[in-house]
Structure formats: C-alpha cells, structure tokens
C-alpha cells in the first residue's frame, strides 16, 4: 500500500497535510491527557479555558510553563522531516496542524497553518500586542515571571493558543478550508478527527474529489472516509512513503 500511496503523492500537484497530537507524541510531547502525575488531578477544562484564566491566571500560567519546558526538550522526529521533504519536492502545498508545539516550524515547514495557535506565542488580554517568544529572545524572562505582563500596556499576557470554548482563528481556518477545497490529496497524520471545525478538512478534500490518506497507530473518526489507511507510527511510515515517492520521481 505504501507504493500506491506514493504513486498518488508523486502525481499530486496540490497535496496538503493535516496533523494532530499523534505526530508530536513520537517526539515526546505530552498529550493533554497524558499520564504525567503533576497535572493529572486537573481536568483540561479546569486549566485551558478563558474562565480558568480569569479565575486563577497563576495556576494556568504554571501549567503552560510546565508544558513549554516539556516541549523545549522535544525535537522534530522523522515524520516532521518527511513532510518538509514533500514540501521541498513541490508536492505538499501546506501543513495544517492542530498542534501548538512549533515542531513543524522547527523542522523547516514553510507554509504552516496553526489552527490552535502556538504555545511559544503570547498575546495581551487587553491590547492587540502579540509576540513570538523564540524570536524576541524573551522566553526565559516570561518563564521566570509569575504572571507575565504586556510590555506595551502592562495588562496580563496569555498563551496565544485556542482554549476550550474559544473559536478558532478565522483567518487560519479560512486559509485551511480554501486549501482543502483545492487539494487533490490530504495526508491525515496522528489525529483523532474528533475536534471540530478542524476535523472537517479531510471531508472537504474528499467532497472536492481528492484522495484521503490516513497515517495513524489506530483507526480514527476519519478512517471510514480514508482511501488509504497506513497503520503505524508516523515517524516510521512517512519516511518510507517519501523514499518511494523519490524513487518514482527519479
């Protein structure tokens, strides 16, 4: 089946990738409901909502600092790099991700749409200030503060991620949907397909006549519409697919 998938991609002009937590789990990024005891006693709804932040911003920031420190130790894995290779070959138009861990960017993905934000970006709760902490060199400073403040207006900063009950960023979602409408193939990697509206993406590709290729360790909500289901870890499966694509294009 790897050969058949490679054939689809090799002849594709407008493929996209749609990625979820599974691709990052292989890099050691803890999933939200991971087994780390420290935050297990809290439900995600108690930490990742606007209400939780209004009630106890210090606790929410402690949780996000813990996550940031965990993610800083993670490195992109072969699956991230395989997607970069497909982009370099001119096959992949964009990577649309539900992940906030910045690993696609670190791997070298150029056209990246982050539907759920980025944990290394902060935004002000009052004014329109935003900052990508890896670029501004202020990451260490922010991690040391109990309650990071906006350098422009002094109000509280918050992580620039989408919390439960918040809408997805309109611009990113529109871009993602437009790409999906034009896509002739979508690589669905490591997502449960349960979080909407992001999970509409494979369905849009399917309805527009494109091929749905799923790479996952287990079947998901997307599997019933997948034309190809490659069972396995993305870090093992995707490099094999890319190798085959290269062979076909030689």
Swiss-Prot record:
In its UniProt entry, what is this protein called? NAD-dependent protein deacylase
Instruction: Please state what the annotation says regarding this protein's domains.
Output: 2 residues (Tyr-64 and Arg-67) present in a large hydrophobic pocket are probably involved in substrate specificity. They are important for desuccinylation activity, but dispensable for deacetylation activity.
Family of the protein in this entry: Belongs to the sirtuin family. Class III subfamily.
Against NCBIfam families, the record matches this protein to: PRK00481.1-3, prot_deacyl_CobB
- Positions bound to Zn(2+): 124, 127, 150, 153
Q: Which GO terms describe its cellular component?
A: cytoplasm
Q: What molecular function does GO assign, one term? A: protein-succinyllysine desuccinylase activity
Signal peptide range in chain numbering: none
Q: Which domain of life is it from?
A: Archaea
Query: Can you give the residue ranges of the Deacetylase sirtuin-type domain?
Result: 1-250
| Active-site positions on this chain | 116 (proton acceptor)
Q: What is its EC number?
A: 2.3.1.286
Q: Which UniProt keywords apply?
A: Cytoplasm, Metal-binding, NAD, Transcription, Transcription regulation, Transferase, Zinc
**Which residues does the annotation say bind NAD(+)?**
20-39, 98-101, 190-192, 216-218, 234
Q: Which InterPro entries match?
A: DHS-like_NAD/FAD-binding_dom, NAD-dep_sirtuin_deacylases, Sirtuin, Sirtuin_cat_small_dom_sf, Sirtuin_class_III, Ssirtuin_cat_dom
- Which positions in this protein are listed as binding substrate? 64, 67
Job of this protein: NAD-dependent lysine deacetylase and desuccinylase that specifically removes acetyl and succinyl groups on target proteins. Modulates the activities of several proteins which are inactive in their acylated form. Deacetylates the N-terminal lysine residue of Alba, the major archaeal chromatin protein and that, in turn, increases Alba's DNA binding affinity, thereby repressing transcription.
Fetch the PROSITE patterns from UniProt.
SIRTUIN (PS50305)
Q: What cofactor does this one take?
A: Zn(2+)
* EC top class named in words: transferase
List the catalytic activities from the record. N(6)-acetyl-L-lysyl-[protein] + NAD(+) + H2O = 2''-O-acetyl-ADP-D-ribose + nicotinamide + L-lysyl-[protein]; N(6)-succinyl-L-lysyl-[protein] + NAD(+) + H2O = 2''-O-succinyl-ADP-D-ribose + nicotinamide + L-lysyl-[protein]
Annotated localization:
Cytoplasm
Tell me how the cofactor is bound.
Answer: Binds 1 zinc ion per subunit.
